[in-house]
Structure formats: C-alpha cells, structure tokens
Amino acid sequence: MLNRRAFLASMTGAAAVTRLAAAPRRPNIVLILADDMGFSDIGCYGSEISTPNLDRLAQRGLRFTQFYNTARCCPTRASILTGLYPHQAGVGHMIQDRGVPSYQGYLNDRCVTIAEVLRTAGYRTLMSGKWHVGEDRPHWPTDRGFEKYFGLISGASNYWRLDEGRKMAMDDKPWTPPPQGFYMTDAITDYAVKFIDQYGRGPEPFFLYAAYTAPHWPLHAHPQDIQKYEGKYMKGWDELRKERHRRQIEMGIVDKRWPLTPRDERAPAWETVEDRKARDRAMAVYAAQVDRLDQDIGRVLAKIREIGAEENTLVIFLADNGGCAEEINRGVKGVPPGPPDSYFSYGLPWANASNTPFRLYKHWVHEGGIATPFIAYCPSIVKERGKIVHEVGHIVDLMATCVDLAGAKYPQTFNGKPIQPMEGKSLVPVFQGRSLGSRKLFWEHEGNRAVRDGKWKLVSRYPKEWELYDLEADRTEMNDLSAKMPERVAQMAKDYAAWAARCGVKTPEELGKKTKQKG
C-alpha cells in the first residue's frame, strides 16, 4: 500500500499531466496566522499599534467583524488545516494524548489537510512557521501534504533561541537556530519569502501557510521596535480600552449599541498600580512584537508584488485565539521584557485591553476568546475595496474556500482511509458580495462550550451554567437572557449535545485530571 507521502506524489504527478491550462489562472493562496493576538490589536481593528501593511490590506480588501477561531492554538490549527472541528481531527485539546481518539494530540487519518487536497490539484504547497498539531514523525508538515517546510514543530518558544525540549525542522529534518542573529518572526518570514521566490514564479499556483508565533509570550522584541512604544502605555489599560473602543465604533467594526465590557474584576484600576513603568514596558514589548509582525508581513507582500502575482493571490490574515491572560515570569531575575534572558507575558489586564470590547480570553469561548480579526485581499476575487463584512465566518470555512478557489475535489477517501466531510462553507460568495445565510456553529475547549445559531449564542464558562445572548443587540455579552428564554436554552443545549456526541467531545471529568500545556 502507498504511504501518505507516496500517494500524494503520485496524485500530484497525475494532476500535472492532466491539468488543463486555466484562464484565468487559479489563484495563489497565502494564509497568515498570528498567535495569541486580540481582536483590537491591529490598526484596522482599533489599535494604536502601527500596522500599515495589514491596514492597507484591509483598505483594499475586506474585513470581517464576526469571524471566529476555537480559543486555543492547537485546536485552531487543526481546524484551519482540515475544515473540521478540532475534535474530529484528533486535537480536541492540545498535543498530549488524552487517551481517546478525539484528543489524541495530532491530526488523525480520517482528515485531510488543505495542503494534501491542493497538492493533488496541482498546487505547490509551502509552509513556514508554527505547526503544533503533531510533535513526532509521521505527523510533521511534510507528512501532511507540504512540499516545503521551515519552522517550529512545537508550541511557544524563546524568539531569540530555541527553548529546551522544543523542536524546529527544515522539511523533514531537525533544524537548530544559529547562536547569533536569529529572531523567530524574522526567520519565519525569511523562509516564507524564499519559498515564494522559489515556487511562485512557475506555472503552478501555490499555497503558502505562514503561521507566526508572534505576539505569543515570551515578550521578546528588537530594541528599535520597543523604543517606538515605551512610555506610550503609561496612560494605562483603562484609558487604552476606551480609546480602542471609540475607534472601533468610528470604523464600523463595533456597533455603538454594544457597551464596552467592564474592566475584568481581577485587573486593578490603573491609578492604583504601583509598578506602572514595568507594566508600560510589558505592553510596549507586546506592541513591538505586533509591529514587527506587520513589518514582516510587508516583506511577504512585497515579494508577491515582485514576482508579479499580486493580482491573483488571495491573502488572508487572522489569529488563532484571543489575547492571553496567562501570567508568565520565569526569566533571569532583573532582566526586563525584550531580550533573550527575559521570559514574561503581558498579563491579564493588558489582555483585557487586547480583546476590546469583549470579555474573557484565550481558553474561553466567550467572544474575547474566539473573535478574531479577519482580512481578505485579492484584486481578482475581492471586488469591494475596504468593505466591512458582518457575515458570520469560522475557521472551518477555510478548507471549503481553498477547495472552491482551487477547483479541487475534496476526497471521500484518502490513502485508503475514509475521510470525514467538511464542516465549513466556502467564503467565496462573501468575497463577491453575497451572503452565506444563517448557520449553527459550535465550540468546546477545556469544558468551556458554546453554540451560535443565527443571532443567538449559548455559552458556558466551565463549570458554570449556560448563558444566552442576542449577539445582534449585545455582542459584548452583557445581558444574559437564559432565565427569560428557557425554551431557547433547552433547544440550543440539545443541539450542542448532539454535536458534542457526533464530534467525540468529552468533559474534563471524562478525560480525567487536566494537564497544563504550553500553547
């Protein structure tokens, strides 16, 4: 029997022989993923951080206001790559095997990746960045459809050097960063640009997945980038949230009817904070990470223009989850955030600002954990420049979108194994000004659970009871209607239970004692 890689090679060859000259040529697809970045952290979503390249994409393309991820790094990556809910792909939690198929910690053989599907359709398949859906062979990117790979197989790591126990790879071989001159965001970009230069000039279209680690902790950034922001956050998180919310309303990203959520009760009022200078430094380094991410995305876009591919390259940008409230401080004592010997996160109060106007964070499935910026730009596909889209989208839609644009066929079987049907819808109609219609979407992570059905959202913060919100009137989830509408709660809870059973969702109690994972 052919193994997965041999099967792909044979199918790719067949596709090359039988492929007809397309007019117009099928689009290149560049999918850019940020890590642990909040809803309001880039300029075109209300931020003060300088992100001119992403802002320009939004001005010339479209922005979604209601696009969702799965609240955590590994599950989001599994869903993006497969078009399935993470449990269906085997990554219901993180990369640890929890003893049941839906939580095995790596992509299973009942799913296919975008790379596997597009490669059989004649695309060159390229990846640079964070994988985090399979630590060991044969579960690396080159085992799952990518011809070329550079990046971090594992989760978060020091930006300046590889943390002990973390893995990087070049194609199918381990790779170690040089002792000097390495910075993770820049390195991911270097290889993304190199791959476009090498494979973007040929007759075949290409798919590039650029999965950055920025701005995930630890807070590491170039001194010149930090310098731009140090001192700018002495105004504090309370004022920052108000300013971002005001800009979001002016932009049309947020409805003025939706109140800004109160400051998280665990975050102190800024005027009571004693270590303000240290807090300012932390947010300045975080902003510098976002700034550098945008600079490097600019390098990717410049290379696309250089090879003459801008007109027919779809560029998509989004984040894997909301801002992260985890408190991390394990670097060398006395070293501030930024250099290699530091190891900090920016903490809950700044994460609360990152997720403006929503509440809660990465891990949770309230809007603060799952709402992401989403930008799509392609002159030949996205016709309405600067449009703000209020359609509901989800990362499961990315597989269907890529299959649609590539003229590919999503398989019922692959390498002799039955493949689960896609869960998402193609976003191409939205790119062309049409509607996707009403839909039901589901979430579960660490016992936190949610259902969205049209304007209604049923959500629970584990181990609490269900809450019900009308997101059309109350996107910031301030007015719980569950007590007033028990019938709707019961019906949506029934829908959730059916989905959970179908997808192999387990409660924390069923999985046993939870193990902390770096993500």
Where are the language model's segments positioned?
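Formylglycine-dependent sulfatase
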Residues: 2-462, 466, 473-494, 498-501, ...
